[in-house]
Every structure is written in C-alpha cells, then in structure tokens.
C-alpha cells in the first residue's frame, strides 16, 4: 500500500536516525500523527532548538550551549588529566558517576577502515594540538569502547601521545568486550577508571 506523501516523508525522515528501520519509522510516523498538535509543535521546536542552540566546544569537542563548555571552563576541575571518549554521550555517562573530576576530549568517532574513517575524520589532530599547548596535562586516559575499532583507536592515540612524555592509560576492562560506555552503570565505570592501565 502506498502511503500519502506527508506520511512517506515522515517515515523517510525517521529512517535517517541511527538504528531506525522502516518498521520502527512507520510506527513512529503514525504515533506522531496521533499526537496532539501542541505536542507535535513542541517536539518539532525541540529538534530545531537543539540544532540551532547547540554547538561543539572548541577545546574538547563536547556538545555545549556556550564556548568553551562548562567542563572546560570549570577552574576547579583537575586539568592534569584528560579522558578521551568516542562521543559526547560518553562524557555524560562518565559525569553521571560523579567520581572523575578531570577534563575530556571527544573524538566524534573511531578509526574504522571498513567505514573509510581514518585519523583525519575524527578529532585526533585537535587532541594533539591541545596536548602541545597545555603543559599541565600529565595523563591521557583513553576511554574508547571495548570494540575492535575502539581498541585500534586507543593504540593509535597511545602511539602518538607517548613521545610527548605524557602518561597514557586505558580504562580497565570492567567493561565487557564489545560494550559501549553509554550503557555501563556508574559502578562499572568507576571501577574501570580506578583500574585503568598504562599502555
């Protein structure tokens, strides 16, 4: 059956989101149509506002409303440590445990030859510039996910950073291989930070 064009466009829009296939997109489209008009308007405004009002911190690459972000601007944080993560959502996960008080650097991806992603496609160059510019940084804690791509990215960064006489550590693997930081509970993350190992 052919859907009316507005529904087809809505389904296509939902399918642009990661992890949303045609069945889920169709279900979301029909749910949206059944929503109250005020709720649809609020939903649309939230999308527009998030896209318009948020940007990336020029220092760490995290999502922010102001530049630098609140974490980079906070003088009470330990500026001798930088945790390197894949995505902004990983910063949120680590902040939720309220045990780590250093800084972050968001890569916005990992090295993935299969997907054609090399070092120039993620935020590695800005990390290296940051380390050269800020002599207070004494340790880089690599917190990429425990996936083959995350491991390859961690080893690549470690090779680049070690000559600068900066300690490079990796989260302990309280995290299961193949798991994402985003889904780990606070205690697992705390143990992983505490048990980090030099690489």
Curated annotation (Swiss-Prot):
GO annotation (BP), single: DNA recombination
Record's protein name: Recombination protein RecR
Family the UniProt entry places it in: Belongs to the RecR family.
NCBIfam families per UniProt: recR
Entry function: May play a role in DNA repair. It seems to be involved in an RecBC-independent recombinational process of DNA repair. It may act with RecF and RecO.
Domain Toprim: start-end pairs: 80-176
Zinc finger (C4-type): 57-72
Cited Gene3D superfamilies: 3.30.60.80, 3.40.1360.10, 6.10.250.240, RecR Domain 1
Molecular function in Gene Ontology: DNA binding; zinc ion binding
Pfam families from the UniProt entry: RecR_C, RecR_HhH, RecR_ZnF, Toprim_4
Key words of the record: DNA damage, DNA recombination, DNA repair, Metal-binding, Zinc, Zinc-finger
């Amino acid at each position: 059956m052919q859907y009316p064009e507005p529904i087809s466009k809505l389904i296509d829009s939902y399918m642009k989101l990661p992890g949303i296939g045609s069945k889920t997109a169709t279900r979301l489209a029909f749910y949206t149509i059944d929503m109250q008009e005020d709720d649809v308007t609020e939903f649309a405004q939230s999308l527009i506002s998030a896209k318009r009002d948020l940007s990336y911190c020029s220092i760490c690459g995290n999502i922010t409303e102001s530049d630098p972000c609140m974490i980079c601007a906070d003088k009470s944080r330990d500026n001798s440590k930088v945790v390197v993560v894949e995505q902004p959502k990983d910063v949120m996960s680590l902040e939720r445990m309220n045990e780590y008080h250093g800084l972050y650097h968001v890569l916005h991806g990992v090295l993935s030859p299969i997907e054609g992603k090399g070092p120039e496609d993620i935020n590695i160059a800005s990390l290296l510039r940051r380390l050269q510019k800020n002599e207070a940084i004494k340790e880089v804690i690599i917190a990429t996910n425990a996936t083959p791509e995350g491991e390859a990215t961690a080893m690549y960064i470690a090779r680049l950073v070690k000559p600068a006489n900066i300690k490079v550590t990796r989260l302990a693997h309280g995290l299961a291989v193949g798991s994402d930081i985003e889904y780990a509970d606070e205690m697992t993350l705390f143990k992983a930070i505490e048990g980090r190992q030099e690489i």
